[in-house]
Amino acid sequence: FTDVRLNLWLLDVASGKMTVVDNDAHNNLNTSGGAIESPRWSPDSRWLTYAKRLPGQMNAAFVYEVSTGRATQITDGMSDAVEPVFSRDGKYLFFAASTNVATNVGWLDMARLDKPVTRSLYAVVLNKDAASPFAPESDEEAVKAASDDASGEKKDDKKDDKKTEKKEDAGAKKETKIDFAGISQRIVALPVPDRAYAGLQTADGKLFYGEFIPNKPGFTLNTFEFKDRKSSVYAEGVSNYTLS
């Protein structure tokens, strides 16, 4: 949670201990009325990610390790990075970033009103050994293996084994491993055009994100499917949403 002094706090419910995670000291003119933006947990609850404003008035994405109490900046501050969120499998960190937000930093005049801010969507490959979500795909067709099932019993056994494996996978805790060395070289852009994006949330194999379109009520909720590497409209006229 945050307070009026722009601190982000972490409360251990079991012990009642409260820890200051970070402070958004350079965001004292935050028009949203809050401090550090959109803190989100990793799937294993070992990391917390958030965006905060830097001295140059650009936001950057950070991750905080609960066990060490150390916060690490992920983006370089040359673009305005906001709304970082972990993928459900803990392999990636997604965020939206803008390189034309500087014309909107000023707040005292109305000259910035006709300069809409656009953002691109990015994914950070957190583990150095993990594959990029947009690695080149092979165009070779898979060869169907010859079946050595002599009876229906073997097929049933295989089905039961697969069901057991799925249950075990579903119950297993997905560890989020972050290699900070060279992490800036593992940031890749999603193949979507620059738009006024906001409201990033993740589901299994998907990224949901809102798009503000001029002269339309609410925002358009889109979903990006990583398996197909395609985006599609999920709903229109959305005022708010959340994923369980």
Regions flagged by a language model, labelled:
Residues T72-P84, V188-A198, D228-L243:
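Conserved blade-ending motifs and adjacent loop-strand segments that build the rim/top face
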Residues K91-A96, E225-D228:
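C-terminal closing repeat unit and adjoining cap/tail of repeat-based domains
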Residues A131-F134, A196-L200:
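Short, solvent-exposed loop/turn elements at domain surfaces
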Residues G199-S244:
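Cationic-aromatic interfacial patches
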